């Protein structure tokens, strides 16, 4: 056991452990919150494991929510905060390679820690600040390695998503893969196809936005995980660029745009690709716009009206994408051009459809054409943005 200084987020949760212990149960902080405490990373919430059964947890606290009671998890509302409290448990029979067919509540912390994915996540801490470490997770933290608890192949057969979690943790923590764990991913990467795309996407994006994504992408490709992801099979050569980036993406839409460019997706194939990854319609649309803007800017043929239509957010994203790919676009020049535009949105135009109707233009295709002409004229600097100037420009 190792003693460490307990920080504020744990101090605030300490009365929860005390209350469980006063009721005659064991209780510990477990998992990622303990890992992040030791790594001095930001901690937003804590997970608590206890020997108390769910019904006993509910009897101990006045306010609780059955968030996952069939798996032993109760959310307790205490002291103005909410805490997930899970009964010590073992799991068995993972027929779908994700969720256990059977959960058995136990009274032993050791048995609970054995079911966890990686040694650095199989740490527990009592309210005295003592660390319980059954699998040398502390040593692996010092060595900065991701190592499966026990037999790696067994852990990945229990939950195939753990293979993606392994490379995601590599990226977020700047850790490396322990060799047996790495080999187990190589041997079992096909199991990832059993996992829902939504869960894979969540890990994939976290990997991409992590501080050390380059090394993580190397193992994502080398272990074969990429072959089980939508639209990425057979694309290792194109995706290898991800392992050589000077800096990784810091924005999800830019990341997806980067993938689309690297695997040479035609414009009409971006939407099917994004849908295959179960991305939102908003993300789909944004990525299509960023890639289109990047393509246009790369050709160097953009007009002021093109910049207006691209808009500031997508312009900045396209320039980020160009930077990641090492494309020599004149970012500041383009941003300065955009900032000098007379207007930045159609709503800033001095006229609208109602004004044109008042001027005698009937609702018709002509009305839309006149609005477009006025917009292009103002943006390009051909005409001042005033009703009188636009009326003269349109000859109405």
Swiss-Prot record:
It is an enzyme of class 2 (transferase). Keywords: ATP-binding, Magnesium, Metal-binding, Nucleotide-binding, Nucleotidyltransferase, RNA repair, RNA-binding, Transferase, tRNA processing. One of its GO terms (molecular function) is CCA tRNA nucleotidyltransferase activity. Homodimer. Its EC number is 2.7.7.72. The keyword RNA-binding applies. Pfam families: PolyA_pol, PolyA_pol_RNAbd, tRNA_NucTran2_2. A single active site specifically recognizes both ATP and CTP and is responsible for their addition. Belongs to the tRNA nucleotidyltransferase/poly(A) polymerase family. Bacterial CCA-adding enzyme type 3 subfamily. Signal peptide: none annotated. Catalyzes the addition and repair of the essential 3'-terminal CCA sequence in tRNAs without using a nucleic acid template. Adds these three nucleotides in the order of C, C, and A to the tRNA nucleotide-73, using CTP and ATP as substrates and producing inorganic pyrophosphate. tRNA 3'-terminal CCA addition is required both for tRNA processing and repair. Also involved in tRNA surveillance by mediating tandem CCA addition to generate a CCACCA at the 3' terminus of unstable tRNAs. While stable tRNAs receive only 3'-terminal CCA, unstable tRNAs are marked with CCACCA and rapidly degraded. SUPFAM superfamilies: Nucleotidyltransferase (SSF81301), Poly A polymerase C-terminal region-like (SSF81891). Mg(2+) binds at residues 45, 47. InterPro entries: Bact_CCA-adding_enz_type3_sf, CCA-adding_enz_C, CCA-adding_enz_firmicutes, NT_sf, PolA_pol_head_dom, PolyA_RNA-bd. Its cofactor is Mg(2+). This is CCA-adding enzyme. Gene3D superfamilies: 1.10.110.30, 1.10.246.80, 1.20.58.560, Beta Polymerase, domain 2 (3.30.460.10). It comes from the Bacteria. The keyword Nucleus does not apply.
């Amino acid at each position: 056991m190792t003693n460490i200084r307990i920080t504020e987020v744990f101090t605030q949760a300490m009365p929860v452990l005390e209350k469980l212990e006063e009721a005659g149960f064991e209780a510990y902080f477990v998992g990622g919150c303990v890992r992040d405490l030791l790594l001095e990373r930001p901690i937003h919430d804590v997970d608590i494991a206890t020997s108390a059964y769910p019904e006993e947890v509910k009897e101990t606290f006045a306010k609780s929510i059955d968030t996952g009671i069939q798996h032993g998890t109760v959310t307790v509302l205490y002291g103005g905060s909410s805490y997930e409290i899970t009964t010590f448990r073992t799991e068995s029979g993972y027929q779908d390679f994700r969720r256990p067919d059977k959960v058995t509540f136990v009274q032993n912390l050791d048995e609970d820690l054995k079911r966890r994915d990686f040694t650095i996540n199989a740490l527990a801490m009592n309210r005295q600040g003592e660390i319980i470490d059954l699998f040398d997770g502390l040593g692996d933290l010092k060595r900065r390695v991701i190592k499966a608890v026990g037999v790696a192949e067994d852990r990945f057969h229990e939950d195939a998503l753990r293979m993606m979690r392994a490379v995601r943790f590599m990226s977020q923590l700047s850790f490396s893969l322990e060799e047996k764990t790495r080999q187990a991913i190589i041997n079992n990467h096909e199991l990832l196809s059993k996992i829902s795309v939504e869960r894979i996407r969540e890990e994939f994006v976290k990997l991409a936005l992590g501080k050390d994504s380059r090394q993580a992408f190397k193992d994502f490709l080398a272990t074969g995980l990429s072959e089980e992801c939508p639209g990425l099979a057979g694309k290792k050569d194109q995706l290898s660029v991800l392992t050589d980036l000077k800096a990784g993406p810091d924005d999800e839409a830019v990341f997806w745009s980067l993938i689309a460019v690297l695997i040479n997706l035609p414009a009409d194939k971006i939407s099917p690709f994004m849908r295959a990854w179960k991305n939102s319609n908003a993300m789909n649309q944004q990525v299509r716009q960023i890639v289109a803007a990047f393509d246009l800017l790369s050709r160097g043929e953009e007009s002021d009206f093109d910049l207006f239509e691209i808009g500031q957010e997508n312009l900045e994203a396209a320039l980020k994408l160009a930077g990641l790919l090492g494309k020599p676009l004149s970012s500041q020049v383009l941003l300065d051009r955009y900032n000098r535009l007379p207007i930045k949105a159609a709503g800033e135009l001095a006229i609208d459809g109602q004004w044109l109707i008042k001027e005698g233009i009937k609702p018709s295709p002509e009305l839309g054409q006149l609005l477009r002409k006025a917009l292009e004229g103002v943006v390009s600097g051909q005409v001042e943005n005033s009703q009188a100037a636009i009326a003269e420009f349109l000859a109405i």
